[in-house]
Amino acid sequence: MILLQSHSRFLLQTLLTRAQNLDKAVELDYQWIEFDDVRYHVQVTMKNPNLLLLSVSLPNPPPEAMSFDGLPLGAIEAIKTTYGTGFQILDPPRDGFSLTLKLNFSKVRPDEELLTKLASIREVVMGAPLKIIFKHLASRTVAPELDRLVAIMHRPNETFFLVPQADKVTVAFPMRFKDSVDTILATSFLKEFVEARRAAALNTAPSCSWSPTAPQELEGAPKETLSANAGFVTFVIFPRHVEGKKLDRTVWNLSTFHAYVSYHVKFSEGFMHTRMRRRVESMIQALDQAKPLEKTRSMNNKSFKRLGLNEVNHTNSK
């Protein structure tokens, strides 16, 4: 299984390149989109080469998701905690974006560790609500401001759900796919995923289950959020899964779970297409090799017609 990296590789490379060439006044203006419709924009001007603006656009949160000014609950506090005073949050952000950070290279030492953190801005922002819930779980409490059923946005117009309790947090994903082939492959993949969890080597991993219908924990969720053509996956997270360094890994793996499944579905589909092409090519080669043999056999197995005496004389006269 391949896990997605928490930092944007292109963003990290852009930041490292800029940090290594601060003595050069170079103008940058890069925009790109990564999985689940998260858009980035990096700007550096010739006028202020030590200032870098990083803007991030997140998908619009659906009504049931916890959000504040277009950002997940706790995102601003998470940014301040992660990056400290070396970064400035612009209010309002650049037009068309959910968040804009200003980095002054003359005031911040741009080492690789710091830039890797900045390249992980997606994890910091979108994982903020999960961290709030899981930090309370680690202390075996429940945040008083949370509802019994918490919805968190993770894809455009889609949410997954958490049921926080003092001793555990139940996480449920409605799995939706637009393509019918993707739906079939995802359903098969998820069943195998759940089956693999039963292996002895994974005894300490969070328990998980798959069902074609919504689990009981999602009772009370809006009906439109429970349409899942690939079923529902449920994880149960205990305090031991969010202790110490495990917290960040658990938050990232859950917030990108649908993307993780989608990646493996597309990879499997591509692998099957490759196998099919190879089989077709091998069949074509076999047919091509059979053609000369058929010609040889037809030459060796010619049938001769017996001619009459008059026909022989007529043939010889020609």
From Swiss-Prot:
Pfam families: P34-Arc
UniProt-listed InterPro entries: ARPC2 (IPR007188), ARPC2/4 (IPR034666)
UniProt note on tissues of expression: Expressed at low levels in all tissues with a relatively highest expression in inflorescences.
Region Disordered, annotated ranges: 297-318
Keyword Cytoplasm: yes
Record keywords: Actin-binding, Cell projection, Cytoplasm, Cytoskeleton
Subcellular location: Cytoplasm, Cytoskeleton; Cell projection
Gene Ontology biological process terms, A to Z: actin filament organization; actin filament polymerization; Arp2/3 complex-mediated actin nucleation; trichome morphogenesis
Phenotype of null mutants: Distorted trichomes.
GO molecular function: actin binding
Family recorded in the similarity comment: Belongs to the ARPC2 family.
Cited function: Functions as actin-binding component of the Arp2/3 complex which is involved in regulation of actin polymerization and together with an activating nucleation-promoting factor (NPF) mediates the formation of branched actin networks. Seems to contact the mother actin filament. Arp2/3 complex plays a critical role in the control of cell morphogenesis via the modulation of cell polarity development.
Subunit structure: Component of the Arp2/3 complex composed of ARP2, ARP3, ARPC1/p41-ARC, ARPC2/p34-ARC, ARPC3/p21-ARC, ARPC4/p20-ARC and ARPC5/p16-ARC. Interacts with ARPC4.
Protein known as: Actin-related protein 2/3 complex subunit 2A
Encoding gene (name): ARPC2A
